[in-house]
Swiss-Prot record:
Transmembrane segments: none annotated. The lineage of its organism: Viruses, Varidnaviria, Bamfordvirae, Nucleocytoviricota, Pokkesviricetes. One of its GO terms (biological process) is taxis. This is Protein MGF 360-1L. Plays a role in virus cell tropism, and may be required for efficient virus replication in macrophages. It holds the Pfam family ASFV_360. Belongs to the asfivirus MGF 360 family. It comes from the Viruses. InterPro entries: ASFV_MGF360 (IPR002595).
């Protein structure tokens, strides 16, 4: 809650519809940043406050807005964002002048951030899914000594990127580059078009990374765009293998299949990664590597997969195979997350119902 009546008044004013005739009032009230009015909005799911201006039109969390205000040594906004609920400790991440550091400490910040607090800050800011937030987090944090020297963060980022790094060795790149790749991957995961274009324009040499993330995070629209725009060094079967590592990647599995990837290898990869949904899709698409898949499932003592693979009445789904398209719009409709269910999965579940008298 705002700590003063003035801060509360500004907060209420910032939530109102803005007209150009009101700009002079907002500027006098301190609701002005980068030559434009400040407005606040709330996220739909967790009701977090998002600060918006012309420069950050998709919105920043209060804490990220605070970090930017501290970097700019904008004391009025530092006080305002703190009164609106920002954690003043976040300001220590970007502080660059003694007078601003003194203000942060006056507002309640500690003298220095512990390694655990730095880690907490990173994971606090990473989850807000707006282009403005992702881009600014990259600009403020990717080359920030507090984060570059955090051993715990290095281990966690290494772990998150390791599975995706099919054509690079993480040991051979700097942590700064790892963080850049991480924020790029978040833009693709959350399907943030403007953030994706920001990274694509500034890091054109990461084109393979964009494609990898599009495959792994089931972003068939971005995968299609980059695959048709750039020459890639990644084999189509490598792309399919990556898609099959994450259950539910139906659109990118289908896309790779239509480009000619080996669907039997995809089936085997799905079993190796215990991805039941992907396995059924591969069967729908004509995969028949049952012998090899049963051997893998048996070695893992995975009786759920073994029983699925022992069922004999599977057949390809002609409705999937007849379309033969790489159009992401059509693929997305065909494999809609809420509507699509594998024909062969339904057949298998029906067989269990007849045996046990209950749905699985």
């Amino acid at each position: 809650m705002p700590s003063t009546l003035q801060a509360l008044t500004k907060k209420v004013l910032a939530t109102q519809p803005i007209f150009k005739d009101d700009y002079c009032i907002l500027e006098r009230c301190g609701l002005w940043w980068h030559e434009a009015p400040i407005t606040i909005h709330h996220t739909c799911i967790d009701k977090q406050i998002l600060v918006k201006t012309a420069s950050f039109k998709h919105g920043l969390t209060l804490n990220v807005a605070l970090m930017k205000a501290v970097q700019e040594n904008n004391h009025d906004l530092i006080e305002l964002f703190t009164e609106w609920g920002a954690d003043i400790s976040f300001g220590l991440v970007t502080v660059n002048m003694e007078c601003t550091q003194d203000l942060c400490q006056k507002l309640g910040a500690r003298k220095a951030l512990s390694e655990n607090k730095i880690l907490e800050i990173f994971y606090n800011v990473k989850y807000v899914k707006t282009s403005s937030n992702i881009i600014l987090c990259h600009e403020l944090l990717s080359n920030n000594p507090l984060f570059l020297n955090n051993a715990q963060l290095k281990l966690r980022i290494f772990g998150e990127l390791d599975a995706l790094s099919i054509n690079i060795t993480l040991d051979n790149i700097s942590f700064n580059e790892m963080l850049t790749r991480y924020w790029y991957s978040m833009a693709i995961l959350y399907k943030l078009t403007e953030a994706i274009q920001y990274f694509y324009q500034r890091y054109s040499h990461f084109k393979d990374w964009r494609l990898i993330c599009g495959v792994a995070y089931n972003n068939v629209f971005d995968l299609h765009e980059i695959y048709n725009k750039e020459k890639t060094n990644i084999d189509i079967d490598e792309m399919m293998q990556l898609a099959c590592m994450y259950d539910g990647n139906y659109t990118t599995i289908y896309y790779c299949c239509m480009l000619g990837a080996d669907i039997n290898r995809a089936m085997i990869t799905s079993v190796m990664n215990f991805c039941e949904g992907n396995l059924f899709l591969c069967i729908d698409l004509g995969a028949d590597a049952f012998k090899e898949s049963i051997e893998i499932a048996s070695q893992a003592n995975n009786w759920i997969l073994i029983n699925i693979l022992l069922f004999k009445n599977y057949s390809p789904d002609s409705s999937l195979l007849s379309l033969k398209t790489t159009d992401p719009e059509k693929i997305n409709v065909l494999l809609d997350e809420e509507k699509y269910k594998s024909k062969n999965m339904l057949m298998y579940e029906e067989s269990l119902f007849h045996i046990y008298g209950t749905n699985t």
